[in-house]
Amino acid sequence: MGKNKKQAAEGEEARRGSESSGSSAEPSGAVAELPSFKKTAGGARSGLIEQDAVDTIREQTAVKFADEDEVVEQDEAAQKTEAVASESSSLADKEECDESKLDHFRKFFRRTSSRSSDEGEGGGMMERFINMTGGGMVPVVTEAPEEDEEAGPDPTAEAEAAAREIMKAHHLSSGQSVDMMSMSSSGESGFFMPVAEHYDDEYNPEQEEEQRDDMSEATYVPPPQHVRGGVLGSLLRLYQNQPGGQAPQRPGLRKSAQTLSSETLPTGESYEMPKFKAKRPRGSKIPNPIKLKRKSAMSEARITVHIADLLQRHRFILRLCKAFMMYGAPTHRLEEYMVMTSRVLEIDSQFLYLPGCMVVSFGDTITRTSEVQLVRCSQGLNLWKLHQVHSIYKQVVHDIISVEDASRTIETIMAEKNLYPAWMCVLLYGFCASMVTPFAFGGDWINLVVSFGIGCCVGLLQFIVAQRSHVYSNVFEITASIVVSFCARALGSIPNSNICFGSTVQGSLALILPGYIILCGSLELQSRSLVAGSVRMFYAIIYSLFLGFGITLGAALFGWIYRDATNETVCEKELSPWFRFIFVPGFALGLSLINQARWSQIPVMVCIACSGYVVTYWSGQHFTASTEFTASIGAFVIGIMGNLYSRIWKGLAMTAMLPGIFVQVPSGIASKSTLLSSVQSANNMVSNGTNAAVNSVDGRTSISFGITMIQVCIGISVGLFASTLVVYPFGKKRTGLFTL
């Protein structure tokens, strides 16, 4: 027992001495002096375990440096991609590395603890060694302070920061720049169109009601805040919304992030992309096919309805324009009417009027293109149909009826026949000629009957022959003036017939005088429509020369046939001036019926026409040498009455004023008797043959007739504009001024 106690004491002293010598050793030996540590641990098995720990530490240190180099390379490659994607990938990679290291050391600790469980003190020594070396990462003797552990990087905190960044990137608004999001192309987002601020593919009833209220409060129809896109833009929008549509690929475009990363990063068997562990559940990137199909169907239906509505509005604008031109709307305000209509319908369009045609351009704000349409038709006068079309125009502008109903109504109006057939118009032509002869050209009762017969011949040529022969319609004015002049001189040459040649010729040609043409031209010039006004004025002058040439040729033909033809241009017998006021209502009635006016419109027309003639007659008695001034006074009165009828009684001013304007033109022409100057030229042609003086006289008379027509119509246009300014000083609220 004594020896055993002595040996135990010596072993305890030796063990304490070895521990003191090991603790006094300097730690500068680091990894290279680790074999000295083996000497302190006795036993072969303990040496193997310690050698395994050293090898594990070296391997993990090398893995750490390799992982850090790999992270640096990945960071350099990820600079060419998006910030959010690169940051999330690097954080996930680092987290994976840390987790793998922790798992490895957990397994190693469990393995060593299981191996040393049978050795007693050896297991405690290994636990102390692992704790002193900081988990095997840095081999030091003393334990690391708690402050250094807290100062080190925390994988959990880094993972939470990365998660917050990913969530922030995931919830970015779609209105931000596309470059900050994923740049990979897809079938839906790969095809981009220019954003149109006025594209109205989303139907919003509340927004439309607010727009209508704003427009009703305005004093005129302003340009719409939102215009409808064109057909081409809608079709492109439909193509874009297709679920299976592929974006068009073009060489030279910017490559996606996946392509850039695959080109810059190394490839091969030695390189493996890091595998990330899903820390939170993520939704599938594949969209729900049922929702996609439903969304595509709704979008297609909405765009289809939009295209159909857009085409319907375009068709209505074209039909309305054609109806206005066919039925005699004021040409100097025609562009204004169409602009008002297009603004109300939210259509981006422009209009250019030329005599006989209208150029219409429909714009498309989506594709920056335009569709040009040309509306051509033969212009005429139909007062009743014009009244109906204007009523539809007002209802559409004030949003009373829909565009579809308005289009169908216009089609019905255009398909209807005229109120009065052609044979009745022929008789009305004779009636008007007989009515205008006494009060405008000084004819008596016998001349009234003769003018009726010759006027029926003119009506036959215009309504029957010219309508059936396009070739004859080009020479109608010349042939009609030749026939009228020849027949009137033949009848006037009958002895003791008391037929006045001058009054008969002028009365029979009163309805084909170019007064309305010159009036429209002067109104267009005064409205700054230079192209249309200049063309119409020049045509009216040439038209007047045609009439003068026809009168001269017809009178000369009868003079060559009958040498004793009459040369008298002034009637011997005239009716009392008071009888003239009786024939004016008849002439206005005949003009209204020829121009297809309804009987309900006639009383207002006749009243306005009679008032204008009374003013013209008495002003002519005072201003004998000023034809244009007299015409302007009469037109001013007619315009005041017509515009008041439109403003107070809500009638159509243009249709009410037109017969009164027609009454003013023959009166102005008769005041200077320019048509009769052609008879003097015809007499000189028959008596003197081909003389130079005769040609000069004929040229002066033809030009003087055209100049007289222009003077009268300019006076009428000035009076009409002055009357409009008095009644409508600020225009109308939403519709254009439908007046002369």
Curated annotation (Swiss-Prot):
For this UniProt entry, the molecular function terms from Gene Ontology, in alphabetical order, are:
transmembrane transporter activity
Compartment list? Membrane
Domain of life of the organism encoding this protein: Eukaryota
Polar residues bias locations:
256-267
Residue ranges under compositional bias (Low complexity)?
A: 19-33
- Which segments cross the bilayer? 422-442, 445-465, 475-495, 499-519, 541-561, 574-594, 599-619, 622-642, 651-671, 707-727
Q: Report residue spans for region: Disordered.
A: 1-48, 65-97, 241-269
This chain belongs to the protein called: Pheromone-regulated membrane protein 10
Q: Which organism is it from?
A: Eremothecium gossypii (strain ATCC 10895 / CBS 109.51 / FGSC 9923 / NRRL Y-1056) (Yeast)
